[in-house]
A protein has these predicted regions:
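Conserved acidic carboxylate
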Residues: 7
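Two-component/phosphorelay signaling modules centered on CheY-like receiver
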Residues: 10-28
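Acidic, metal-coordinating helix/loop segments flanking the phosphotransfer/catalytic sites
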Residues: 29-47
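Acidic catalytic/metal-coordinating carboxylates
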Residues: 32-35, 58-64
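Active-site residues of response regulator receiver
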Residues: 51, 81
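The feature encodes the CheY-like receiver
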Residues: 55, 73
Length: 129
């Protein structure tokens, strides 16, 4: 399974990649929204992990673009946010499959919860096909 990780924080990107690879996933990186959109269309991942605070194109605009593109709109997107759950309902309405609050305080716990979220979303996506 291929996961596109769109995250501008090198620290978060490396931590999430390590957890995903350990869980058996192949990871594609994108450090900004523009690169993330391009990678999604070129690589057609099974899942997108999308940070909300990105340079060039915001996470919300990336989510809207992904869900508006017939080529990739079927790909589930898990939104990653360090700002808490204030916009969770709005992002789920925009098409996010799940919302994940990231924390730098408990990285190990973060990683295991993220993997659980990834597995749940991918399992739901398979069930719908």
């Amino acid at each position: 399974m291929k996961v596109l990780l769109i995250e501008d924080s090198k620290f978060q990107r490396l931590a999430n990649e390590r957890a995903l690879v350990k869980a058996g996933y192949s990871v594609i990186h994108a450090a900004d929204g523009e690169q993330g959109l391009r990678s999604a269309c070129e690589q057609l991942p099974d899942l997108v992990l999308l940070d909300m605070m990105l340079p060039k194109v915001s996470g919300l605009d990336v989510l809207r673009a992904l869900k508006g593109d017939p080529l990739v709109k079927h790909i589930p997107v898990i939104v990653l946010s360090g700002l808490g759950q204030a916009n969770e309902a709005k992002l789920l309405k925009e098409g996010a499959a799940a919302f994940f609050v990231k924390s730098e305080k408990s990285l190990e716990n973060n990683s295991s919860i993220l993997i659980q979220a990834v597995e749940a979303v991918l399992s739901n996506a398979k069930a719908r096909v």
